[in-house]
Amino acid sequence: MRPSGRQPQEMRTVSFEPGVAKHAEGSCLVRFGDTHVLCTASLEERVPPFLKGGGQGWVTAEYGMLPRSTHERMRREAAQGKQSGRTQEIQRLVGRSLRSVVDLKALGERQISVDCDVLQADGGTRTASITGAWVALHQCIEWMRARSMISAPVLKDHVAAISCGIYQGVPVVDLDYAEDSTADTDANFVITGKGGICEIQGTAEGEPFSDEEFLSLLALAKTSIADLVRRQKEAVSA
């Protein structure tokens, strides 16, 4: 039995609240149960130096956790003078995931910076960040389209992410902190609306997991991400 009482294939309650930030071109407050992440997308009329004059844009991401997003207060990374390896890994993952579904040529020589700030953490912050960031990015691109800044389609597809794991010998989806901290296997899947796999991160905490177990996790992830994509569509069309 899962601590939350959910079935193995049951995600937490998921919601998207677009347009929550007054100043950002795109924004979304995404909730996966008690994990809440504020995602904002900001348009900048510049590109990184390595892209100057190349006629294409860029999408990048930053990730951070508020000091009291966790059970005990954690120091701000700015106060420590450097980002942790975990923070750098997650923000690169978010950026890669978003770029996988963006036509950078259609964006022109502009950069969209997506900030994912964890307000409250209860497991799955990186997967929630990716899923909410797509909604914020979509809103930013529509902001540009409404001002005739772009004409060709920029977004090629949806992208969403979900965690899966082996908990007490059972494959489960969307692990909360209680499950994630004691799971036998923990994996994150990033998948597009068409079912293409962008990234898989998987770790056996104890015994190695089998091909059969991996395929069961992949099946759970694909079903759940199809549901998340449906919810994204509802959020951006509301």
Swiss-Prot record:
Record GO terms (molecular function): 3'-5'-RNA exonuclease activity; tRNA binding; tRNA nucleotidyltransferase activity
Residues that coordinate or bind phosphate: R86, G124, T125, R126
Disulfide bonds: none
EC number: 2.7.7.56
GO BP terms in the entry: rRNA catabolic process; rRNA processing; tRNA processing
Pfam families for this protein: RNase_PH, RNase_PH_C
Substrates-to-products reaction catalysed: tRNA(n+1) + phosphate = tRNA(n) + a ribonucleoside 5'-diphosphate
SUPFAM superfamilies linked: Ribonuclease PH domain 2-like, Ribosomal protein S5 domain 2-like
Entry keyword set: Nucleotidyltransferase, RNA-binding, rRNA processing, Transferase, tRNA processing, tRNA-binding
Enzymatic class: transferase
InterPro entries reported in the protein's UniProt record: ExoRNase_PH_dom1, ExoRNase_PH_dom2, ExoRNase_PH_dom2_sf, PNPase/RNase_PH_dom_sf, Ribosomal_Su5_D2-typ_SF, RNase_PH, RNase_PH_bac-type, RNase_PH_CS
Role description: Phosphorolytic 3'-5' exoribonuclease that plays an important role in tRNA 3'-end maturation. Removes nucleotide residues following the 3'-CCA terminus of tRNAs; can also add nucleotides to the ends of RNA molecules by using nucleoside diphosphates as substrates, but this may not be physiologically important. Probably plays a role in initiation of 16S rRNA degradation (leading to ribosome degradation) during starvation.
Family: Belongs to the RNase PH family.
Subunit structure as annotated in this protein's UniProt entry: Homohexameric ring arranged as a trimer of dimers.
Database matches in NCBIfam families: RNasePH
UniProt protein name: Ribonuclease PH
Gene designation: rph
